[in-house]
């Protein structure tokens, strides 16, 4: 079976040394970087890049030439690939809650912005980008519709609620999800193929124990195991990094193949 690491939040404000610290010692393990095209310096009330001061409020990732050079070298070596991580990774304060940007956008705006910034990332890193990752893994039905229009894959977990346009594809996976939940106590499906895009389940990496449990469930049902990290958390929490290394070691010993996210859609 395949496993893949999706690491979120690389942006203009990221130093290449931070990515190297998080992943440079993971020899032979590729990492799919979810890159923010034009990042806001803070994410709501979360400050992944510290509290500044910053030289700008919004930063185009391509303006960080040192970072782009580092990532491009990693792409050439098969260490990294680029996924698109929202537009600004911006949050809006609504009724005392922080709402991620992809929950606060309509269809036409989504099509325009996603196409614009996908092209920007592809030109910046000289690579094809096929996968969109929503900040906080949250997006409204207009984003799903836009991604299908554009033909970009994504990662999501099907909800019990009807949270997107009704289609034959969606109903098929919605029913399968609920049957799996009832009979297997595990709602993952694997690759979900819609009209013009595909979707995959993914899991947060919190600790070794919970991740190992999810890995074994994916193995039992012959599904790819894709989990996501944040490089800035790995760098600030030694136990989290230690648990990640332990998980990788155990999965490889178990015969799992380290892969990039885009390889898991195949």
Regions found by a protein language model. Give the residues of each.
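Short catalytic/ligand-binding loop motif for oxyanion handling, primarily in non-cytosolic enzymes
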Residues: 12-14, 40-44, 90-95, 138-143, ...
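Active-site-adjacent pocket scaffolds in enzyme catalytic domains
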Residues: 43-72, 76, 131-225
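C-terminal domain-boundary segment and adjacent tail
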Residues: 154-156, 219-266
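Active-site beta->alpha N-cap acidic-glycine motif
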Residues: 1-77, 123, 128, 227
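CE4/NodB-like, metal-dependent polysaccharide N-deacetylase domain
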Residues: 30, 104-140, 217-228
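Short, conserved active-site loop motifs that form the nucleotide-linked donor/cofactor pocket
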Residues: 79-80, 256
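Generic structural signal for well-ordered alpha-helices
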Residues: 17-23, 68-72, 111-118, 144, ...
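A cross-domain feature marking catalytic cores of carbohydrate-active enzymes
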Residues: 7-9, 33-37, 84-86, 133-136, ...
């Amino acid at each position: 079976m395949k496993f893949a690491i999706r690491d979120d939040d690389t942006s203009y404000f990221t130093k290449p040394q931070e990515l190297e610290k998080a992943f440079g010692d993971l020899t032979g393990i590729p990492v799919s970087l979810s890159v923010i095209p034009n990042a806001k310096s803070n994410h709501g009330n979360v400050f992944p890049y510290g509290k500044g001061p910053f030289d700008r409020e919004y930063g185009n990732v391509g303006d960080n030439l040192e970072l782009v050079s580092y990532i491009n070298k990693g792409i050439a070596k098969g260490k990294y690939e680029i996924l698109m991580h929202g537009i600004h990774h911006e949050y809006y304060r609504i009724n005392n809650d922080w709402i991620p940007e992809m929950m606060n956008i309509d269809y036409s705006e989504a099509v325009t912005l996603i196409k614009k910034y996908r092209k920007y990332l592809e030109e910046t890193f000289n690579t094809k980008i096929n996968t969109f990752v929503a900040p906080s893994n949250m997006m409204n039905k207009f984003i799903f519709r836009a991604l299908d229009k554009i033909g970009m894959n994504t990662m999501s977990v099907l909800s019990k609620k009807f949270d997107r346009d009704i289609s034959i594809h969606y109903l098929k996976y919605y029913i399968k999800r609920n049957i799996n939940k009832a009979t297997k106590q595990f709602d993952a499906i694997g690759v979900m193929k819609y009209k013009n895009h595909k979707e995959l389940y993914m899991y947060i990496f919190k600790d070794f124990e919970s991740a190992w449990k999810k890995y074994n469930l994916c193995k039992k049902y012959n599904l790819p195991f894709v989990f996501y990290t944040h490089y800035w958390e790995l760098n600030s929490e030694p136990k989290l990094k230690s648990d990640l290394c332990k998980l990788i070691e155990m999965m490889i010993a178990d015969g799992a193949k380290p892969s990039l996210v885009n390889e898991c859609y195949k």
